[in-house]
Amino acid sequence: MKIAVYPGSFDPITNGHLEILKRALNIFDKVIMLVAVNPNKKSRFSAEERVAMIKEAVNDERVVVDSYQGLTVEYAKKHGASHLIRGLRAVTDFEYEFSLASANDFIDSSVDTVFLMSKAEKSFINSSMIMELYQSGVDVSALVPASVLKRLK
């Protein structure tokens, strides 16, 4: 069984994240969506809320949702995952993601990173932008799943 970990803050999860997940499921038998917990980063939603939003948005037995504080590559190894999934919205994401993948490879070269490009129509979507638009009164219902929308209201 090919298992991948798709880590992220998912604060909140967006339709862009879900599009990357859908494509990852075409490659892997199981994907673990891993909510990253970073005590040094202020989150809009708690880890528990983010896990709940993802579980409500994703109805697929091939997807497991979990949260973790620590090195993602170590989590992947512990849970039998051979790959990490990273979504790229634009070329500007690549430099940071490449550095992260290189660091993960240094820690454990048995876990590879797979980069999936966002579809052009979803490349502008990110969690911070969603929150800014929502707080400005813009309807974001086309950009986030219903599980997020109900928590924004």
Predicted regions and their residues:
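Nucleotidyltransferase catalytic core that binds NTPs
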Residues: 1-153
